[in-house]
Amino acid sequence: VARSVRLVPTLPAASLLACALVLSACGGGVHGTPGGSGVRDPYFPKAGNGGYDVTHYGLRLAYDPGARHLTGTAVLTARAEKDLSAFNLDLLGMEVEKVTVGGEIARWNRAGQELTVRPHGDIGRDATFRVTVRYSGTPETVTDPDGSQEGWLRTADGVLALGEPTGSMAWFPGNHHPSDKAAYDLAVTVPEGLHAVSNGELRSERTARGSTTFVWHSGEPMASYLATLAIGRFDISRSRAGDLPLYTAVDPAEAAASRPVLGRIPEVLRWSERRFGPYPFSSAGAIVDSAASVGYALETQTRPVFPGAPDMTLLVHELAHQWYGDSVTPESWRDMWLNEGFATYAEWLWEEDHGGAGAQKTFDEVYSGASFDTEEAAEEIWEFPPADPPGAGQISDPPVYVRGAMVLQKVRQAVGDDRFFSILRGWAATYRHGNADTADFTAYVEKQAPGTDLEAVWDEWLYGEGKPEQP
């Protein structure tokens, strides 16, 4: 693994005083310890970092598609969760040029994806501090354990940045684990004629001297894997769903095919609000952009990304994630079924509410194998329990999606429709803009359905190995 080290000489005592004034935490008798790399995620042990919580990312980027060169300044505002002598950020590749903490030059070194920062003085527990990283280079494409690609992905006329599960570290430094959510402000400068599309609301768009700067704001907390950036030529559509602003950006080659389905975003949002509760964000929309190496859609917050014109099933799935996955975000990657099982069940509910098969019929056909084209596909969903994928390469496999949805149908069978739909809405409301794990979900359901025996649902469908004997 390539290593680089940058050591900065010790600053004079006057700088210590300046640091104390800026941080309200440096020196002053604080004796911290390093925050550490990783947060002990069972599948991505190096993802995220200990000792602090990021509350805001301020990213200022400039991208030259011809040279494939990105220049960035990242300003992270964070709160120390312990006394810190050092802390880590996740950043893959790129050349780090300068790091400051509270405006004071900090020492730093790199090893793989870990950028270790040593502020001039220790940071006290509960103190708010600001770290600024200047960096540049050609961001990398990341290959997942399952073979899919993410990170910084080239398109015909620009790039597409996708982050699930760890790709965002390819284009900005951060605490890249779903358990740390933050607000974002992103300013991106690109050659005139190109658009830069991200999450949240477009605050401004200014062109000068052959370049255009787009400024995006995401006020609601967002896990970094849900951050996106699409640079290229797009057909832009601005509209509203009631009071909610919609912004869609579509590759011109996909515009005609995408228009009929994307035009139904307001309808899907209205239906979703009836089923899942109030929409959790202040804007919505979609991005349709094609990177040759990407064959999947992703629920990037407020603005899902589709690799081509979506159908209704895919649109319903990705918009359902705005409640389940984006607003209620998994505590760790082991809890992915709370994303994908819920979004898959949303597909079943959409069919049920729009003249198609009921969710119970869909469940029965999945259980019998009738809904699959091959016997192999029918057997795949029983390879492991949805709440316990065997490894990082399986967190997006069929059991997480389909068997995860089956768990919800079993809960519905056990508690009845009225209580079940109350649980769906209440779960989204209780953990709105937060994190939750599987134990939180089972406890929540049991609290909402006192006296209901759910042991078999959890033991056989959620955690059990193999195919349960009875549907």
Give the ranges of each region predicted by the language model.
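N-terminal, polar/Ser/Thr-rich
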Residues: 2, 17, 22, 26-71, ...
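Surface-exposed beta-strand/loop patches in extracellular or lumenal glycoproteins
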Residues: 73-95, 172-176, 183-191, 439
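Short, hydrophobic/aromatic-enriched beta-strand segments in well-ordered soluble domains
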Residues: 74-78, 127-141, 184-192, 214-220
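A surface-exposed beta-strand-loop module
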Residues: 91-153
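Glycine/proline-rich low-complexity spacer/linker segments in large multi-domain proteins
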Residues: 125, 135-184
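Hydrophobic helix-coil surface modules that form long, contiguous segments used
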Residues: 177-316, 345
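Zinc-dependent metallopeptidase catalytic helix centered on the HExxH motif
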Residues: 179, 301-368
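Amphipathic alpha-helical substructures
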Residues: 358, 397-471
